[in-house]
Every structure is written in structure tokens, then in C-alpha cells.
A protein has these predicted regions:
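Active-site metal-coordination segments of metallo-dependent hydrolases
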Residues: 84-95, 105
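Long, well-structured alpha-helical subdomains associated
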Residues: 101-164, 174
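Hydrophobic (often cysteine-bearing) scaffold residues that line and stabilize catalytic clefts
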Residues: 18, 68, 92-95, 134, ...
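Catalytic phosphate/metal-binding cores of nucleic-acid and nucleotide-processing enzymes, i.e., regions
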Residues: 39-40, 71, 135, 140
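Intrinsically disordered, low-complexity linkers and terminal tails enriched in Pro/Gly
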Residues: 1-8, 159-167
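An acidic intrinsically disordered interaction segment
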Residues: 60-71, 143
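Contiguous, non-catalytic segments that form substrate-binding/exosite surfaces or channel walls
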Residues: 1-62
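Active-site recognition of the HExxH zinc-binding catalytic motif
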Residues: 66-85, 96
Length: 174
């Protein structure tokens, strides 16, 4: 199962709201993410990766869970495009959805929009090396996006801690 891909995690896994998860996703910054009001009506999803402009465009007005999953798919495309000459998102939609599924599961966002109900037919005729290559691509995308998200979210949580608590000089009157 693709959700078995895991990075080393802290002992206590923090929980995030969907809004915090979206904030972390946007902080990832492998590429710019631009929310646009005049989103193309011919697009199937609420976000897409533009390889020529090296940018993710997302539709304004979506809920946090849809923003997360749709932008996660687009960011996975951006990550994979770094290593593939002439990258075409349509050829890697399954891998990008898998990466978005893992990210959504990891950060507590609903996976309904990116659930995987079947494997593409080409995987049935692919040799083991090809499957491993695709799984490695998914893993690397998840790792890179998650790493950036985690850093941004930890930084955000640390900023919420008061300077008194941070320095350890709380109200201990010994």
C-alpha cells in the first residue's frame, strides 16, 4: 500500500488543522503557488502545475481539504518535474495522486479526493525496476514536500510558544 511509505517521524506526532496543513503546504516553496480568481474552466482539479512557468495555479474559493489535496497533487508534479526532462503531468497523474494521498494521510487531511481505487494498466506490464523507479519518485516527492511542510509547521508552533516558556524561566519559585 502506498501509504506505507514513511519518513522517520518524531515520537509524538503533532496534529494539525486542515488550515495549518494548507499553510505548511504553501510554505514548502519548491515552486510558487498562486491562487487565481479566473481559474481555467477546462481544468478537472482545483490546482495544476504549469511546467513552462514552473508554478502551481490554484482556484480561489475552495475549502481547506480540497486546497490541500489539489495543491499537493500539483506540488508532487513540480517535485517530479525536477528530475524528468520534458515532464508531462498527464503521464504522471497516478504518482502525483499517490504522493498527495500519503501527505493528506500524514497531516490528518481527508484522503477522499485522492483515494486510489485502482492501479493504472501500465503497471501490470511494467517490470520490477520500473515499478521501483516510480515508487522511489513518489517517495522522494513526499519526502521533499513533507520536509518543507514540517519545518514550516514546527517553526509556526515554536513562534506560538512564549519567550518565557522557551527560555525555561517559567514560574518555578524554588
Amino acid at each position: 500500500d502506498i501509504s506505507d511509505i514513511k519518513d522517520p517521524e518524531p515520537d509524538v506526532q503533532p496534529t494539525y488543522t486542515a488550515a495549518e496543513a494548507v499553510q505548511g503546504l504553501f510554505a514548502h516553496k519548491a515552486v510558487d503557488v498562486r491562487m487565481i480568481p479566473d481559474y481555467p474552466s477546462d481544468r478537472q482539479f482545483g490546482a495544476f502545475y504549469d511546467a513552462e512557468g514552473n508554478c502551481v495555479y490554484a482556484k480561489r474559493g475552495m475549502g481547506y481539504e480540497q486546497i490541500f489535496t489539489d495543491v499537493a497533487v500539483a506540488l508532487a508534479h513540480a517535485e517530479m518535474a525536477k528530475d524528468i526532462e520534458g515532464y508531462l503531468p498527464a503521464e504522471h497523474q497516478f504518482e502525483a495522486r499517490c504522493a498527495a494521498y500519503v501527505l493528506a494521510k500524514k497531516y490528518g487531511v481527508s484522503t477522499k479526493a485522492v483515494e486510489i481505487d485502482r492501479v493504472p494498466e501500465e503497471y501490470g506490464v511494467m517490470d520490477a525496476a520500473g515499478i521501483r523507479e516510480n515508487l522511489a519518485r513518489i517517495h522522494d516527492s513526499v519526502k521533499n514536500i513533507s520536509s518543507g511542510m514540517y519545518k514550516a509547521l514546527v517553526k509556526e508552533k515554536e513562534q506560538e510558544v512564549s519567550p518565557k516558556e522557551k527560555s525555561g524561566k517559567g514560574g518555578d519559585a524554588r
